């Protein structure tokens, strides 16, 4: 049987994957000072697409440029989709100025996916750092939609400050509605903060899961993922059941330009989701 690394979910691409399809902005929601979510619907010219948790799109701001962004919405809501984006460059700055009713071009969905089916019958540990919660959010939706198929589900989430926490209201709803363990930590906080303080890896040692029967999925800054994997391995989580999302300088989305190549893999085509045993020799290596 093919694994998540050997095949991508067949994406409902338009006949020309290099041609952006028009989407209309339905809603703009400010998440934090530098992060926002766009909710988009397909225009009347096409029907949109379905996607698997962990896949990404290339978002095109007409007249400005294109940037790869993971899909952050519930797969069950497709073709309505959401993208949560941090303002970090020219394209995302222009994207932040878009308003309800404006058009955005989308190519995709591209890439491999989180192992939500492979994790059935296991404990699932989800470790997110900062904006890394956004690519993991579709997996959380899918896990909760079929909660009875999994054992423990644990979300460990780290941000810089309490003000940087994404989807704060949603996290509280999930904690109360589902059998879901959620632990949040921040790097620094005022004395009024009642949660954990410290890097997210400090949560792993006390998190309630069975390492011998756990699937772990991790997304965040590369350095954070490296240390997270180290702590998971100390607990006994197998490298082949530890999944990371690597999104490095993707341009075409279909493996043609080679811009996202590092080592023998292309992040846009072979990833962005990889098992750690495959990715371990490449972590920290610059693109070729």
Residue ranges of each PLM-predicted region?
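FNR/FR-type flavoprotein reductase catalytic core
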Residues: 3, 90-251
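Ferredoxin-reductase
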Residues: 6-102, 160-161
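Short, charged beta-turn/beta-strand-edge "cap" motif at the junction between a beta-strand
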Residues: 63-66, 107-113, 286
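Local cysteine-cluster metal-coordination motifs and their immediate loop/turn environment
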Residues: 223, 247-272
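Non-heme iron-sulfur electron-transfer modules
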Residues: 263-288
């Amino acid at each position: 049987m093919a694994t998540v690394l050997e095949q991508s979910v067949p994406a409902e691409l338009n006949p020309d994957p290099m041609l952006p399809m028009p989407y209309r902005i339905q809603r703009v929601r400010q998440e934090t000072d530098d992060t926002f979510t766009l909710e988009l619907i397909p225009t009347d010219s096409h029907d949109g697409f379905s996607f698997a948790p962990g896949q990404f799109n290339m978002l095109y701001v007409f007249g400005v440029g294109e940037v790869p962004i993971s899909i952050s919405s519930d797969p069950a809501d497709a073709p309505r989709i959401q993208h949560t984006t941090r303002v970090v460059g020219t394209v995302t700055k222009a994207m932040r100025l878009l308003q309800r009713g404006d058009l955005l071009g989308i190519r995709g969905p591209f890439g491999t996916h989180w192992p939500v089916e492979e994790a059935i019958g296991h404990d699932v540990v989800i470790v997110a750092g900062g904006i890394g919660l956004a690519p993991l959010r579709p997996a959380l939706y899918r896990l909760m939609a079929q909660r009875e198929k999994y054992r423990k589900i644990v979300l460990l989430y780290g941000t810089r400050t309490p003000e940087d926490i994404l989807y704060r209201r949603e996290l509280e709803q999930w904690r109360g509605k589902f059998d879901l363990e959620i632990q949040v930590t921040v790097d620094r906080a005022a004395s009024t903060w009642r949660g954990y303080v410290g890097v997210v890896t400090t949560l792993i040692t006390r998190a309630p899961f069975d390492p011998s029967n756990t699937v772990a999925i991790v997304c965040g800054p590369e350095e954070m993922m490296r240390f997270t994997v180290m702590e998971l391995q100390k607990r006994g989580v197998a490298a082949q059941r530890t999944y990371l999302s690597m999104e490095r300088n993707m341009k075409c989305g279909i493996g043609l330009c080679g811009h996202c190549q590092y080592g023998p893999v292309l992040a846009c085509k072979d990833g962005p989701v990889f098992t750690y045993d495959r990715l371990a020799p490449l972590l920290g290596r610059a693109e070729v």
